[in-house]
Amino acid sequence: TLFDCRTEPVYQFRYPGNHYEDFNSIPDLIVQSLLFIENRDLLSDKNPLVNPAVDWPRFFKAALTQVGKALDLDGQSAGGSTLATQVEKYRHSEDGLTYSPQEKIRQMVSASVRAYRLGENTLEARKLVVWAYLNSVPLSAAPGYGEVHGLGDGLWVWFAADPQRVNQLLDTRLNQSVDLAEQGLALRQVVALMIAHRRPSYYLAVSGRSDLNTLTDSHIR
């Protein structure tokens, strides 16, 4: 926002156009869906001091798959990025990508420092990770719009859905009398975008929609 000498706004532009003001404004079903796909224990209070930037089992599994890939061994590729390191990557790494092991370590260190800036109890920092991720996850680019960032704009651009309506449908405080079919469609669209972020340029293109639908079906049963 640009202000004049009287502090009156003269120009205002918000990008992404649809975003969550804070963690508490995110519908619980959206949070639960993200955690189900990415990290089911991220917001657990069992270990209040946990570092959300590091998931060692996931990290070592990803490292082993990279070794297997280098040796031309068959196997499914696994990613080692936590939500916290993904946010660091989108915001600060060149082109939003990880080009080297050194860059991955830098992301982990940066995300770790950020996780403890509010104190040794990281629950609030972990909530901020979820909030930042949903507001900034890159979801390819669309003709006539440009780059798409965040779940809200993704719903609007890729599914022509009203983000506010989707939020209402998936907020258990507000959806007691909504149509279940409409609610199911909203949840499916949200889950599809959470899956699509792995290869957004492919899954959100016409050629990749069939594969995206198949993966979405495997998560919603």
What is each residue range found by the language model?
Residues G75-R221:
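Non-catalytic, structured segments within soluble enzyme domains
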Residues E21, R40-S44:
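Short beta-strands and strand-coil junctions in structured, solvent-facing domains, enriched
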Residues D28, D45-L71, G80, I105, ...:
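Acidic helix-start/capping segments at beta-turn-to-alpha-helix junctions
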Residues D28-V31, E124:
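Hydrophobic/aromatic-rich, well-ordered segments within soluble, folded domains that form packed cores
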Residues T1-L29:
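Terminal hydrophobic membrane-targeting helix
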Residues C5-T7, I26-L29, I37-R40, H92, ...:
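Solvent-exposed coil/turn segments that connect beta secondary-structure elements
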